[in-house]
Swiss-Prot record:
Protein's organism: Phenylobacterium zucineum (strain HLK1)
Name under which the protein is recorded: Large ribosomal subunit protein uL5
Similarity comment: Belongs to the universal ribosomal protein uL5 family.
InterPro entries: Ribosomal_uL5, Ribosomal_uL5_bac-type, Ribosomal_uL5_C, Ribosomal_uL5_CS, Ribosomal_uL5_dom_sf, Ribosomal_uL5_N
Record gene name: rplE
Listed Gene3D superfamilies: 3.30.1440.10
Keywords: Ribonucleoprotein, Ribosomal protein, RNA-binding, rRNA-binding, tRNA-binding
Lineage: Bacteria, Pseudomonadati, Pseudomonadota, Alphaproteobacteria, Caulobacterales
GO cellular component: ribonucleoprotein complex; ribosome
GO biological process, one term: translation
Length: 186
């Protein structure tokens, strides 16, 4: 048992069940045609960082706890006088998850975080971009179990983008349904 490598639950499920299901449903002739998850990008926009640079450090620390890896800061591309924003100022942070960390995060998102969202009815099945990628937003980062409510100074929102190798939205939707994404029934 000690020499056996750990594999995330969803990765094992993809390899053993989901690949076969998608191959049967879409009739792929080649194993490499079967859609798979490529990466998950988590982005936090911290507009308040313009006035107080300590807020970006707090957001980065929280995002590091959620993702399990160190985020990078995102900088403003252009100056906007109305927001007192200059080009190059730090306005947020993001992290890109791949391989095992991606599957671990997805498991926590589906089984723990989304059910804890207030008034959660399901994810919109129309939030695909036309190329097989899914984008969603969370208003509160405190739905993740890694965040202790008593130790945070502010509640942040985040964008979560799931990038797949699927060519169409229908293929990506079926892939995410197989991963038990809680889509709203149309």
């Amino acid at each position: 048992m000690a020499d056996q490598a750990y594999e995330p639950r969803l990765k094992t499920e993809y390899r053993e069940r989901i690949r076969k299901s998608l191959k049967d449903r879409f009739g792929y002739s080649n194993e490499m045609q079967i859609p798979k998850l490529e990466k998950i990008v988590i982005n936090m926009g911290v507009g308040e960082a313009v006035a107080d640079s300590k807020k970006i450090q707090s957001a980065m620390a929280d995002l590091a706890k959620i993702a399990g890896q160190k985020p990078v800061s995102t900088k403003a591309r252009t100056s906007i006088a109305g927001f007192k924003l200059r080009e190059g100022m730090t306005v947020g942070c993001k992290v890109t998850l791949r391989k095992d960390r991606m599957y671990e995060f997805l498991d926590r998102l589906i089984t723990i975080a989304l059910p804890r969202v207030k008034d959660f009815r399901g994810l919109k099945p129309t939030s695909f971009d036309g190329r097989g990628n899914y984008a969603m937003g969370l208003k509160e980062h405190i739905v993740f179990p890694e965040i202790n409510y008593d130790q945070i100074d502010q509640i942040w929102g985040m964008d979560i983008i799931v990038t797949t190798t699927a060519k169409t939205d229908d293929e990506a939707r079926e892939l995410l349904k197989e991963f038990q994404f809680p889509f709203v029934q149309q």
